[in-house]
Amino acid sequence: MEKEEANNENDLSNIKETVLIKKLTKSFKVSNKSSILGIGDDAAVLNFDNQEVVISKDMLVEGVHFDLSYMPLKHLGYKSIVVNVSDILAMNASPSQVLVSIAASNRFKLDAIEAIYDGIRAACSEYNLDLVGGDTTSSNKGLIISVTCLGSINKKKFVTRSGAKDGDILVVSGDLGGSYMGLQVLEREKSVFEVNPNSQPDLSEYTYCIQRQLKPEARKDIVKALDDMDILPTSMIDISDGLSTEINHLSSSSDLSIHIYEDKIPIAEETKKVCDEFGINPTVAALNGGEDYELLFTISKKNSKKIANNSLFRILGSCKKKKNDNCMITSIGQKINISSDGWDPFNK
């Protein structure tokens, strides 16, 4: 009888929406000065003084953006915030608030939604964000998480995709391809599990790549480092859909071409090992993989010396005046066209 009552309490259909929202959000505190009024009213009230307001929204859909057979719900909640924070950072702005809406089918119980919010809470703590609103509703099928992130920036310092100039240097943070290879490992083990549910794989040697896929981090340190060095990028974008796609976005928005060098693309040794195991060229993983959430940006040539010996950055190439000529120069000097073969949700 007690077990049946516990199950009923865990069933979302037995919980009023107002009670559910209070239960999920009671431990969230407002800490940013710009958050005047948060959860609990019809709308949030924000005050950004004389700053420009930056807004980004991303939706994560089960079966399209994530697979719950290997994605822990807490990690999913965390990642849903990170992908939005990364967009705000790509504008050179400081993220400060999020609104989270979740639609879940009746196969999800209260403890599952609470696990997602545990991840959201952890991300809000990591990136100093206030949860100021959102919605929770039912879904006919699966799970959907929609997040809106707000931030602010001095109007003289926000950065777009369209400001690159001829002669500018192309720079990237971190390393690339790890998230994609982590996904390959997880998909392989899922296939093995479907054939043999008793299999217990040792994934310790894949920790780096799996972590890059399941629990990525947005590069708030990069924006701070650039500011500390008094460098304002001429254009910037985050790498969510693969290096090749983002290069094409920057070049088309700035109305020029970008040339990069294959041997300059940063790829972690852990990623290279997994690529070798799967028979995948590491360069292909970096160019087309996606979900690295590193920052790709251009700077004026005069600033290149400031970052030349900084381990946070890697100079990939430069911008050229000629249009429609994005290319990669290989290690043997071959010129290869860079096409947009990154991740596309409508071509999955």
List the predicted regions and their residue ranges.
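Glycine-rich anion-binding loops of enzyme active sites
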Residues: 50, 60, 95-189, 318
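Short, compositionally biased
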Residues: 182-199, 203
